[in-house]
A protein has these predicted regions:
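A short, glycine/Asx- and small/polar-enriched loop/turn
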Residues: 50-54
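Short hydrophobic/aromatic beta-strand micro-patches
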Residues: 11, 57-59
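Short, surface-exposed ligand-recognition loops at beta-strand->loop->(often short) alpha-helix junctions
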Residues: 11-23
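Long, low-complexity, Ser/Thr/Gly/Pro-rich intrinsically disordered segments that act as flexible linkers
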Residues: 93-107
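An amphipathic, aromatic/His-enriched active-site/gating alpha helix that lines ligand/cofactor pockets
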Residues: 23-41, 49, 59-97
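Intrinsic disorder/low-complexity detector
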Residues: 1-3, 91, 101
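Active-site-flanking beta-strand signature of metal-NTP-handling nucleotidyl enzymes
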Residues: 3-11
């Protein structure tokens, strides 16, 4: 059974401190864990105040658990949209790249 890993490369918004970036990443991590993600992994690339970046990974146990998370969104998109609207009012990180990977164990 394939595990699903959503991966985003994030760049800081000009003028945002590392502390502000970390605070936002903690909010995102808390949100995705509450939504049912198996785990969230955050990796820092370079120094956050000197053109650094972040890798933000949302891990799902299986395709079914990833699908359940997507179904949750479509059942009540307003709750998700409200959270995103809050984050957009104080932009801290820009998503430079995003991908969904399927980790297949039987190959």
């Amino acid at each position: 059974m394939a595990r699903i890993i959503e991966t985003a490369i994030l760049n800081p918004v000009e003028g945002k401190t590392r502390a502000q970036q970390v605070a936002r990443l903690k909010e995102w991590k808390k949100h995705w864990l509450a939504e049912g993600a198996d785990k969230v992994v955050v990796k820092e690339l370079g120094a956050g105040n000197i053109g650094g970046a972040w890798i933000f990974e949302i891990h799902h146990k299986s395709g079914a658990s990833y699908g359940a998370l997507i179904d949750t969104y479509y059942k009540n998109p307003k709750s998700y949209d409200d959270v995103v609207a809050k984050w957009q009012k104080t932009p801290t990180l820009n998503i430079a790249s995003y991908a969904v990977a399927f980790e297949v164990e039987d190959i």
